Amino acid sequence: MSARPGLLARAEARLTREWQRRGALAWALTPFACAFGAIAALRRAAYARGWKARVDCGVPVVVVGNVTVGGTGKTPTVIALVDALRAAGFTPGVVSRGYGAKIVAPTAVTPASAPQQAGDEPLLIARRTLAPVWVCPDRVAAVRALKAAHPEVDVVVSDDGLQHYRLARAVEIVVFDHRLGGNGFLLPAGPLREPLSRRRDATLVNDPYSRALPPWPDTFALSLAPGDAWHLARPSRRKPLAQFAGERVLAAAGIGAPERFFATLRAAGVTPATRALPDHYAFATNPFVDDHFDAILITEKDAVKLGTSWRDARIWVVPVEAALDPRLIALVVEKLRGRTSA
């Protein structure tokens, strides 16, 4: 049984379901999708043909993004990629748009930054990797500011920004979840920002159901595994997920694909009631105050907006680790080193 989600979350879930099939709504929206596709194609062509100039910031950029709307697992992928690049001998930094943050100029994000000023994903990345992280809607400005502040950085990972064509990049990685391209239609008739045929260097598929990978070139499985939960008010307290099995548990997530979080918990032996909150939910007030559960499990991305000052002793945070295929890491490293030696 699921706890009742908010109106906005239900509307998002309904639209997501519609995007998985070619129903009446999808077909009715195809004229708008055609217009969207034409505009997007013109933007891509403008940079591909040199009508508009790409900006090389003097440091190779690896873009981790998606061609679909909604969460696919980019943030844990960025964290894992930063760790892998560091292990390969690079000194990585990260740039992001800082969704929801009040930013107009390039801004550094540290583990102590406020989520309202940094954005939840950049703050989580800064805390998990301790790498230099800068945010700005203008990715070029963000990369330049990061490089000026940290000249030792020799590769920049862009958290999203696939459609920010102005920024020159050395590697593009597109991340999908189990829904892949949905009904195959462009926005607003479907979930696609760009056609599935869009060129990229590698594809990651984050499918908790472990189905066969699509037959695309350089496609790799992305595995997300949960770690022990930690207590929001007392982070030093740890608890294996299996120990929640006999408790009344609510799982809540304000991320792009909350069902993926719920599926991860079920696979670990937890059978929670579920609440899908709107993506980037602000947690201005405690949405759990009237809920009667022994424990409430939330994502790390949501936890950065709460802090340890929240007095709800039922809240536990479930961290997620991404396991990257060694062949993907080798592909990225080869392209980066080839660019450096060119």
UniProtKB/Swiss-Prot annotation:
It is an enzyme of class 2 (transferase). It comes from the Bacteria. ATP binds at residues 68-75. It catalyses: a lipid A disaccharide + ATP = a lipid IVA + ADP + H(+). Pathway: Glycolipid biosynthesis; lipid IV(A) biosynthesis; lipid IV(A) from (3R)-3-hydroxytetradecanoyl-[acyl-carrier-protein] and UDP-N-acetyl-alpha-D-glucosamine: step 6/6. Keywords: ATP-binding, Kinase, Lipid A biosynthesis, Lipid biosynthesis, Lipid metabolism, Nucleotide-binding, Transferase. Transfers the gamma-phosphate of ATP to the 4'-position of a tetraacyldisaccharide 1-phosphate intermediate (termed DS-1-P) to form tetraacyldisaccharide 1,4'-bis-phosphate (lipid IVA). This is Tetraacyldisaccharide 4'-kinase. It comes from Burkholderia thailandensis (strain ATCC 700388 / DSM 13276 / CCUG 48851 / CIP 106301 / E264). The gene is lpxK.
